Amino acid sequence: MSEIISFNTEELVKAPATPAQSIPTFKLVSEEHPILKKIMPEFDFQNPPVNPNEFASSLVETCKLNKGYGLSANQCNFEYRVFVMGAGDDYVAHFNPKVVSSSSESHMVEGCLSFPLLGLSITRPAIVDVEYQDFNGEKKTATYSGISARCFLHELDHMNGIVYTSRAKPLALQQGMKKRHKLMKSLRIK
């Protein structure tokens, strides 16, 4: 089974909207930043480095501001094992996430806020059973399928120091980078 996502590249380069509330947002790191290749340590709820609820809220606002579906703490230069994913007003914070089981695989084009305008076909499981902690430290389980499974796995890769470009086949990566370069040139983006 093959799924395809398309995205409006003109929308992606528009200036982000202003957050609705006074929740602080974070700056995204660039694709070359070394934090993207580091394994993130577990978030310690016994001795939290930050307020988990406030931190998750800021991740959500940053994700919305940048028109994303998912955002990990390390994409904002924080070494915490947490990410958020969702759309509209429905986002879920995943602290210390892990996959319990997964299904057969599917192909889909993915993008990443840390790699603007780069769409790559990536193979991932279509369905995943997962465990994580919410912002109160309570253990949760969920089953994600389709784009939600893909988003969870993409963000979990960030937690494990894996960027999606390393999951692409070499020729697909080369073609994607070439297409991205042409698009950035046509949009006059450096």
What residues fall within each predicted segment?
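Positively charged
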Residues: 1-190
